[in-house]
Amino acid sequence: MRQKTLDVLEFEKIKSLVANETISDLGLEKVNQMMPATNFETVVFQMEETDEIAQIYNKHRLPSLSGLSKVSAFIHRADIGGVLNVSELNLIKRLIQVQNQFKTFYNQLVEEDEGVKYPILDDKMNQLPVLTDLFHQINETCDTYDLYDNASYELQGIRSKISSTNQRIRQNLDRIVKSQANQKKLSDAIVTVRNERNVIPVKAEYRQDFNGIVHDQSASGQTLYIEPSSVVEMNNQISRLRHDEAIEKERVLTQLTGYVAADKDALLVAEQVMGQLDFLIAKARYSRSIKGTKPIFKEERTVYLPKAYHPLLNRETVVANTIEFMEDIETVIITGPNTGGKTVTLKTLGLIIVMAQSGLLIPTLDGSQLSVFKNVYCDIGDEQSIEQSLSTFSSHMTNIVEILKHADKHSLVLFDELGAGTDPSEGAALAMSILDHVRKIGSLVMATTHYPELKAYSYNREGVMNASVEFDVDTLSPTYKLLMGVPGRSNAFDISKKLGLSLNIINKAKTMIGTDEKEINEMIESLERNYKRVETQRLELDRLVKEAEQVHDDLSKQYQQFQNYEKSLIEEAKEKANQKIKAATKEADDIIKDLRQLREQKGADVKEHELIDKKKRLDDHYEAKSIKQNVQKQKYDKIVAGDEVKVLSYGQKGEVLEIVNDEEAIVQMGIIKMKLPIEDLEKKQKEKVKPTKMVTRQNRQTIKTELDLRGYRYEDALIELDQYLDQAVLSNYEQVYIIHGKGTGALQKGVQQHLKKHKSVSDFRGGMPSEGGFGVTVATLK
């Protein structure tokens, strides 16, 4: 279809509303590509797709598509030998996770809605590949940010060495900073980090007392950050280990990327299917917002839109109208007052057809019928071009000439105020001639006009119908109701009377018009009354038929469910009975066998108590079943994070780290962390651990997230600020508040200049009114 038509009908606004309902860039891309189809089979299939998903969306809670993203670029990069990072691998993992959740949802849906078929969704679910191995390979190797320590044996060893070396460095430096002899020589008794090296803050005047490397100094120059020589080699060792760690991480990521490349075709299919589902769900969401319904498409030319309304207008205030081209009608001419809704009716018809052929449910009552148009042509509104210096009439006529060149029997043509902008008699003649030409071409036409000559046009030609927009004489305003089959009538006398014009003048005016025109107006008035009555009856009949069909469908469904339930009960009862008979027969055979053995061993001397013992074995059999059921119950006890559990499928103990959802949990078994079904876990009582004496060393005091420098001299304030920032970094604070007061602003300026240069500060800002305003600076730490 022509882009100009889509622009006039504001289809881009509809696309924008659908786009707002998408979750991923995959769905958004498909919305941006959405265009009306013109092939009958394609149009029908697109509508079936949307309607099926809309039915499911309206009845069920769909799985979340959050986190779904386009990953084809990563897949192609993996295929040509690139190495994916952890973030990219996680997006691929999320794609697999989303598709698996949708598969699970669909399987449950099929079980719950027994007898209901979803052929389109079923086909999409069958297209989804099995990517379980790749999911586990990524999931068990990395989290959201980094590789797990146990991603490889080598990586675990390297990180273990880094940890132990760091611990030895800390112990060494702790001895230095806790030494009584060094207390006065240190700016603070802490260990900090500069240039990725562990250092201690030494007062500048005691530099010669510490053998080591100076890595940094405070802004005031009074504190030097020294790496003691006793830890230099250990820090060097950590640097080497970090290098080894990077190499091993690259190796593991290369291996994972290879797995992705091996599954590239399957991943691209998964991306395409999930993107299409996001697109269809967005259509379903938008359709529900406009209470959209599914039209029936027919090969023969048909337009029937019961109670249609323009989807971009306010649903609460817009007047819905039935728009219909009755059998053998090819042209509809709408007359009525200006601003009465004629143009909106044209746009409603055009936009609904464009929406329907794009696979969107349409804003009408159930039962709408449409044919598929190859093109929709519009001449709507004043498109006068100032640059071309065209008049309103010339502008419209230029557009009409272009339409007449391309319109055919597969087209819908919409003319707004046909023939307007020139002499009324010439304009009316042109309008009738243009309509004759379009009818000869075979296009379906709806036109609006205010020329009275066109009212009689339909009575002289076959296939032409009049319509009008209603005017309320009592309120002197249009009602925006469309009356199909009823031409517009003049309301001049009624309006004049309502406004207070003398009856003598009105009566004299009536004598000046012909008898025929009087009779025509009276006939039109009678037609209006009859149309309203028939339309009300037809809507009521449609409602009753729809109600009856729904009741029939519900009863059929319930009857089918009852038959299925009855069948399943009978099968279940037979199975239970067969199991009991089988068990009893086996037990009886065992008892007889044992009795025979006893008789052979003891002759006929079989005691009563021995028979009782054998009989008791049947009772024992049922008790064993009871015990088994108790164990089964125990397995389903509520499990929470921190619980000790037995993993039944592995026979191993583990600890629950996190409850993912109602069905899955993350469990640590030794050095292995796995996501497992909760039904596979059996809760265990934690063993009571004997209390052990703990020796705690406090390396630093707990600090607040704010530092109050009010009352400090400038130099002292900066020294205090330096020490505070070091402690805040070691406490892993992300944000701290420096209170300097307002005063002259000198301290505030000094603090902010100091923060600007400080290596531990990534950013800072003035405080919000709720935080202290200009008297506070908020610093964000690296």
Curated annotation (Swiss-Prot):
The residues that cross the membrane are none
Q: What class of enzyme is it?
A: hydrolase
Q: Which cysteines are joined by disulfide bonds?
A: none
Q: Taking every annotated instance into account, which residue ranges of this chain make up the domain Smr?
A: 707-782
> Mind listing the GO molecular function terms for this protein?
ATP binding; ATP hydrolysis activity; ATP-dependent DNA damage sensor activity; endonuclease activity; mismatched DNA binding; ribosomal large subunit binding; rRNA binding
GO biological process, any: mismatch repair
Instruction: State its Enzyme Commission number(s).
Output: 3.1.-.-, 3.6.4.-
Which positions in this protein are listed as binding ATP? Answer: G336, P337, N338, T339, G340, G341, K342, T343
Q: Which UniProt keywords apply?
A: ATP-binding, DNA-binding, Endonuclease, Hydrolase, Nuclease, Nucleotide-binding, RNA-binding, rRNA-binding
Domain of life, per the record? Bacteria
Spell out the InterPro entries in the cross-references: DNA_mismatch_repair_MutS_C, DNA_mismatch_repair_MutS_core, DNA_mismatch_repair_MutS_sf, MSSS, MutS, MutS2, P-loop_NTPase, Smr_dom
Q: How does it assemble?
A: Homodimer. Binds to stalled ribosomes, contacting rRNA.
- Family the UniProt entry places it in: Belongs to the DNA mismatch repair MutS family. MutS2 subfamily.
What does the function comment of this entry state? Endonuclease that is involved in the suppression of homologous recombination and thus may have a key role in the control of bacterial genetic diversity. Acts as a ribosome collision sensor, splitting the ribosome into its 2 subunits. Detects stalled/collided 70S ribosomes which it binds and splits by an ATP-hydrolysis driven conformational change. Acts upstream of the ribosome quality control system (RQC), a ribosome-associated complex that mediates the extraction of incompletely synthesized nascent chains from stalled ribosomes and their subsequent degradation. Probably generates substrates for RQC.
Under the heading HAMAP family, the entry gives: MutS2
Record's protein name: Endonuclease MutS2
Its gene name is mutS2
